[in-house]
Amino acid sequence: MGKTFNLTRREDGIAILTMDVPGETMNTLKAEFGPEISEILSEIKRDSSIRGLVLISGKKDSFVAGADISMLDACQTAGDAKALSQQGHVVFNELEALNIPVVAAIHGACLGGGLELALACHQRVCSDDGKTMLGVPEVQLGLLPGGGGTQRLPRLVGITTALDMMLTGKQIRPKQALKMGLVNDVVPQTILLQTAVEMALAGKQIAKPVKKSLVNQLLEGTGFGRNIIFDQAAKQVAKKTQGNYPAPAKIIDCVRQGIAKGMQKGLEVEASHFAELVVSKESEALRSIFFATTEMKKETGAEGATPRKVKKAVILGGGLMGGGIASVTTTKAKIPARVKDINEKGLSNALSYAYKLLDKGVKRRHMTPAARDNLMALMTTTTEYKGVKDADIVVEAVFEDLALKHQMVKDIERECGEHTIFASNTSSLPIGQIAQAASRPENVIGLHYFSPVEKMPLVEVIAHAKTSPETIATTVAFARKQGKTPIVVQDGAGFYVNRILALYMNEAAQLLLEGQSVEHLDKALVKFGFPVGPITLLDEVGIDVGAKISPILEKELGERFKAPAAFDKLLSDDRKGRKNGKGFYQYGAASKKKAVDETVYGVLGIKPGVDKEMSAVAERCVVQMLNEAVRCLDAGIIASPRDGDIGAIFGIGFPPFLGGPFHYIDTLGADNLVKILERYQTQYGDRFEPCQRLKAMAAEKARFF
């Protein structure tokens, strides 16, 4: 590898230090850079003609995107990780201690170690470009800022703001960064370097105090007040993480100790906590997700196939799903979308859906009204098949009715070109059955989004036996442009995500009928690590939707998918969930606090009894999901354990700190999982029978990774 840092001297005495990692599109910090930076800093100290220093990136749209995560996996022990953090401290302290002004000129991603580098500079100026974002997202990998970030950030922007940034991993836009005091100036990219040079020539400036509310001044200005901030943050973290993620509590401790005992002590605590987190099983799991998604971005979904460019999309159906799909097509992918619905109400719903989402951006000052209107102009509507002939892809989002979908296929083949892809958003019907109506079955594919479309990151791309590789590759590329994480799955009832979810939900329903309360069931699975409990999820998705999917899965996959009788009783009482304000929970203006509708127990003919241990409740639901995930792998529904992990995490919120179903099975041990399943099989019947692959793995002590 060639040199990453290049020092040039200007006639006015300002030196420019340009960072440009050879052979990479983005700058990342690597352990081997330490000696190179130290040598340059020594050179600067020796040269009395240098009056100031500007740090800038040689990359097009990246300042420094963070530390190279792969170097953490090279750490064999906590001691190795601690040494990495301490090396960063030495270099950044040396930079900060220079007796000349040091200015960071920031354009593009300035994240993690990149922001910590900028914080070690005396001043920061950033471009006003939309690509410029600043943040410390380490917590999302189960880590904390290990290059002095837990110490410098609170001292610059205040404790409350710094904790918010570090505990959420949120990324800050330029104007917001200026307002909070994170940067000293925001300028157009064209004059970024010039401005940074002028700042360096002006000399070290005394930092302007960040404007704080009176409450914040009182809290952050006294030891008693700071204790209130830290205690409140700790309570919120405990509630949010359920004790499953160690990083947030350690971030709070770093800041607390640094403020109370000084910078040096704070850095020592930071290095120690960073090291503990690097070797924690939670961070290892979260980093595995990061590497998996990074790897997947390089794949087309079909080996050797080249995706066609999608210049125009048509969405059939303007309902909740159709409106969401049209919205991400225009706003994220910037691809024109024509929405077709049989009535004007559906079309106005789709337009309103997209407008509301974009207008939120305007209200938050993330975009201008003109930018919103330009994106809205990409969406057009029709009640007939007009203006659809040149569509490259048609996404069907109509009712789950096979005859209706057959009609859609025939209509599109008649109205559109021979190359047009027909992508069905069905959640349960096998794609092969939909393709039976097609004269060009190679163009038919499944594209299963999750609700709400703009928030849920996963899509399942479902290939049936005759889907062409080019159709798969084009659909995968289209989904990525929409900002989605696609996994390619093979055809079959429920595909992957709904198939593993169905057994999990069925088991929760069984526990409910056995006398477990609604609240206890939901709390048990939230404590396990799911974002919401299974009963809340059923209310959100729709009890009627669950009732429609279950018979399809039972018919195709067998008795173990038979849903408990609860569905029929609930639907007879017109309980569909949130959508009609009547489900397991109370809805409406009167029920601000989430409360169970106690009348649901009477409808089900049950009376809540003694609650089981939360861990036992969660285990019964989760082992069903794990067993079925392995069946899906064995049947070729998913291509790899990696895809199964990503599908479960991004599709249904499987706890990320466990790494996904397959990583979790490795943690448990296949032999232990088989024992648990066999114990439940004895107690509750054959729906718990371990699949053959799990039994074989248990016998061989085999692992997935």
Swiss-Prot record:
Its EC number is 4.2.1.17, 5.1.2.3, 1.1.1.35. CDD domains: crotonase-like (cd06558). Residues 1-188 are annotated as: Enoyl-CoA hydratase. One of its GO terms (biological process) is fatty acid beta-oxidation. InterPro entries: 3-OHacyl-CoA_DH_NAD-bd, 3HC_DH_C, 6-PGluconate_DH-like_C_sf, ClpP/crotonase-like_dom_sf, Enoyl-CoA_hydra/iso, FA_oxidation_alpha_subunit, FadJ, NAD(P)-bd_dom_sf. Pathway: Lipid metabolism; fatty acid beta-oxidation. GO terms for cellular component: cytoplasm. The record marks E116, E138 as: Important for catalytic activity. Residues 308-705 are annotated as: 3-hydroxyacyl-CoA dehydrogenase. Heterotetramer of two alpha chains (FadJ) and two beta chains (FadI). Catalyzes the formation of a hydroxyacyl-CoA by addition of water on enoyl-CoA. Also exhibits 3-hydroxyacyl-CoA epimerase and 3-hydroxyacyl-CoA dehydrogenase activities. This is Fatty acid oxidation complex subunit alpha. It comes from Shewanella oneidensis (strain ATCC 700550 / JCM 31522 / CIP 106686 / LMG 19005 / NCIMB 14063 / MR-1). The gene is fadJ.
